[in-house]
C-alpha cells in the first residue's frame, strides 16, 4: 500500500506504546526524520528483536531532525480513560518537538488535537518511516521504564511481561496487590483492589 505524502519538508510521525498494560505510563513519540541521513531497517517496532530496536533507537536519536516523547501517567489514564490519555500523550509529543512539523502522520484510526494538518493511518508503523521511527523510540523508552520498575518491584516480573496482562502478572497482583504505578481503572486491577477491601 502506497501512502501519499504531502509536498512539504517537515513531516512528523507519531506512535504510542502501552495502551494495553495494567501498569505504567502510556508513552508516545514524535519524530521528524532527516532525508539526508537515511536509516536502514525501520519497521514496526513489534516486528523487531529487542536488540535491533535498541540499536535503531540510538540511530534514530542521532540522525533524526528532531524527536520528542509524550506520556500520560496512570493517574491521568484513570481520570481520562486510556483512549483520551493516548490522544493527549500524542499531542504532547508533537508539541514537544523542537521544530514544529508542517504535517503529521499518526498511527491508528484517530487523530489527536493538533494545530497542523494530520492523517491517521492504520498499520502506519509498517507503512510510514516516520511512524516506524516513532514506534521504535516509544517502545524502547517504555520497555526500559518497565525494566527500571522491575528493579524496584522484582516480585511482579515487569522486565519480562512489560506490564501487560499475563498469567504471571495476574498471579503477582493476586499475591502482592497493586502498586501506585498500576492503572486503577483497569478491570484486573480493580478486582484485586476490591478483594483487598473484602468487597469481592
From Swiss-Prot:
Residue numbers binding a divalent metal cation? 15-16, 107
Which keywords are on file for this protein? Cytoplasm, Endonuclease, Hydrolase, Manganese, Metal-binding, Nuclease
Q: Name one GO cellular component term.
A: ribonuclease H2 complex
Gene name in the database record = rnhB
Principal location listed in the UniProt entry: cytoplasm
Q: Report the function annotation for this chain.
A: Endonuclease that specifically degrades the RNA of RNA-DNA hybrids.
Q: Give the enzyme class.
A: hydrolase
Record carries keyword Transcription regulation: no
- What cofactors does this protein use? Mn(2+); Mg(2+)
Q: Name one GO molecular function term.
A: manganese ion binding
Q: Which family does it belong to?
A: Belongs to the RNase HII family.
Q: What is its EC number?
A: 3.1.26.4
Q: Decide whether keyword Oxidoreductase is in the record.
A: no
What name has this protein been given in UniProt?
Ribonuclease HII
Q: Which residues form the RNase H type-2 domain?
A: 9-198
- What does the note under cofactor report? Manganese or magnesium. Binds 1 divalent metal ion per monomer in the absence of substrate. May bind a second metal ion after substrate binding.
Subcellular location per the Swiss-Prot or TrEMBL entry? Cytoplasm
Gene3D superfamilies (alphabetical): Ribonuclease H-like superfamily/Ribonuclease H
According to its UniProt entry, the protein's GO biological process terms are:
DNA replication, removal of RNA primer; mismatch repair
